[in-house]
Amino acid sequence: QDISGWNTSSVTDMSHMFSNTNFNPDLSGWDTSSVTNMQYMFSNTNFNPDISSWDTSSVTDMQYMFSNTDFNSDISSWDTSSVTHMRGMFHYASNFDQDISGWDTSSVIYTTSMFYAAGSFNQDISGWNTSSVTDMSHMFSNTNFNPDISSWDTSSVTDMQYMFYSAESFDSDISSWDTSSVTNMRGMFYHANFNGDISDWDVSSVTDLSYMFRSNSNFNQDISGWDTSRVTKMSYMFYAATNFDQDISDWNVSSVATFATMFDGATGLSNDNKCSIHNTFNSNDFWWYSWGEYCSSDE
């Protein structure tokens, strides 16, 4: 049915409106100036018409708006200055690759899974204001994303778990990121090809480093200076990280409660580094490996 002429000027909530439908109408003329909630509006649809002129200045919630859709239309001029929730906005939107570099993201708090499995997206978003974002978990998981995001303000972020999981193209410079508030880095570079310098990252608030470099066959950076005094989980951290060969014996592992299979399959780790790591980590009763053999005088 043609609903292009509907008077929507008083509508405040359009959440889930067309979710899971086959509807693909012309909505370009709709007055959306009063709408505050657009979450899941077109999720799981074939929606792809022109909505470039929509007034989104009042919208605060766009989470999962285009999740699992065919959408790939121009929304570059949207006013996103009031949006706080962009969680999953383009989740599994495999066609989307539009220029959204000019979006005002200064109010955004959640970018969780925003581009999860959005395999086409590779636009420059280096200028985004991310100073209010607290959750970037899964943001670029399963993507081909690799633009420069070195200047992002990550000072408020607490959760980066699985942020680049299976993001096999990503290897940009993020050495200067402020990670001082991050508590969770679980699986951050799991099954990725990342090998950037993150030696200066402040991980003093992190409690979970499990799976961080699992199955990452490229990573081999010096992270010996990390403050790991609050970390409680290191299980699977370097599991099958076949290129990693660094001495991290200076790490404080006094709070770690699980090292399970931390280095299983880390075939690149030298015997000398195994010895050094063992001599420090062995003071923790939960240490997983019997690597004393690598410290024998005959080695």
What positions do the PLM features span?
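Negatively charged
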Residues: 1-299
